[in-house]
Amino acid sequence: MSLLVVGLSHRSAPVSVLERATLTADAQVKLLQDTVAAEPATEAAVLATCNRIELYADVDKFHAGVAELSTLLAQHSGVGLEELTPYLYVHYEDRAVHHLFSVACGLDSMVVGEGQILGQIKDALATAQELHTAGRLLNDLFQQALRTGKRAHSETGIDRAGQSLVTFGLEQLSAGTAVEAWAKGKRALVIGAGSMSSLAAATLARAGVAEVVIANRTPDRAERLAQILTEGDDTDVLARAVPMDAVPAELTRADVAVSCTGATGLVLTAEAVAAAVEGRTGTPVAVREETPASAAGGLAPAGTDEGCPLDLSAVQGATGFSVMGEAAVAGMDAATLEQHAAWVDRGTVDRRDSRRTPEVEAELITALAATVAAGGRLPERRRPEPVVEAPRPAPALALLDLAMPRDIDAAVHRLLGVRLVDIESLAEASADAPMAADVDLVRRIVADEVAAFGAAQRAAHITPTVVALRTMAADVVANEIARLDGRLPGLDEKQRGEITQTVRRVVDKLLHAPTVRVKQLAAEPGGAGYADALRTLFDLDPETVAAVSRADDRDTSDSTENAKNRGRE
């Protein structure tokens, strides 16, 4: 086995790189074709999701394989090799198997334990089979990865730790409120009708939204999804389909929108979102910005700070207001001053420091020294009264962007009245998510399955050699029986049959123990050399061994094709 995987994912690359390194369906086909056409690779499969791109191949040379696969990924993803290389990871042989099995179990997902990846692995295998780029190794690998993932979900509680990306995103939008309570009665807009969008629509319907509107470039798919939602037994939701050009109008009615399309450009711009929520909160849509420093003194007016509970602009403009001595409290009662001090103390050091010039620091020190000289001690610092800040209003529109590259302009984050959760913010949130205790059990399952797969592959590697040995032994028996017929032409059929059976039994008994034992030894780590030893000891023709191996590959391919045909029926 010379399995190699080269890829990048949300764990190795920033979202800005991932969203540019996406592969369309056509690009995946071309990538697979170019990979098997390259010299080092004989098999290839690509696993491409919104959070990862991985190219699996059976290669005969490690270093040449890494170079070739990295170059092909760069060419077909549209990101230059120099820029892409720092974010690529490489796994080889058993480590590559361990990686895919971990991915299949959801251990490497952005949301640990999510089960959607199994469907994506199944699709990757189906594509490779359809293009005939998956041979025995990758067929066995991906099939066992699927079995491992299913075993992990059935034998452990990893599902309790794992959620779909949709569910996790909705939890982030609900901001601590139960999704069902948050979603109940809302109007939802789902942009796209693929697998992720369909899951989003179904999840929202089960959560209790009043209406789901599906917009898609292919009207039939949107209408079919709307029909499925309407006819579902577990939901009571109004669902309808609209064309993509109706999205701006529908967005003005929606309380929550989920977008996951394959578009290469933005589906929702910041301007479109701002227009959709204009007037919902009773005020024009504003942009969250840092208040710029005043040009005169380099300081923003005290009352203009975001979150400050007091407006000190009037006091600051009053005669006698300064930062020195008793004049500092002119026009301001003590409670007001301490409330403002409490707010300042809770602020960041950077903000406090940025508002102090050297002149201000000097005045403060002078004032403190004068107070100590007059009173003989430092003034006590009274505990300020807690400041009650007015709660911010709930956003008028909640947006969930699950596309890669992004569907919704990142500038929407800065719009007041709008809450946007995208892949980047999900990655940050998931980094702090607690791991379930069952994850350790899943890791043990992965380790067991990796060991079993390695043993099976090593045993399979020696099987053509054993078959060639038994074929050679059968040929020897046939030749010797033919020679016996020439020497003893008077033998009748019964005698000839008994002699033939006796010779075959002798040969089989002589070969049985060595061939069984050599398969056991070959299945152990480091057992790859036993096939070579067997070929050398019995002087087996390499071409005969290769012919047996090719025949096995054809049988595997035929079995796979028949299974696919039965699935279509």
UniProtKB/Swiss-Prot annotation:
GO terms for biological process: protoporphyrinogen IX biosynthetic process from glutamate. Its EC number is 1.2.1.70. Residues 546-569 are annotated as: Disordered. The active site is at C50 (nucleophile). Residues 284-397 are annotated as: Insert. NADP(+) binds at G192, A193, G194, S195, M196, S197. Residues 550-569 have a biased composition (Basic and acidic residues). PANTHER family: GLUTAMYL-TRNA REDUCTASE. This is Glutamyl-tRNA reductase. It comes from Streptomyces avermitilis (strain ATCC 31267 / DSM 46492 / JCM 5070 / NBRC 14893 / NCIMB 12804 / NRRL 8165 / MA-4680). The gene is hemA.
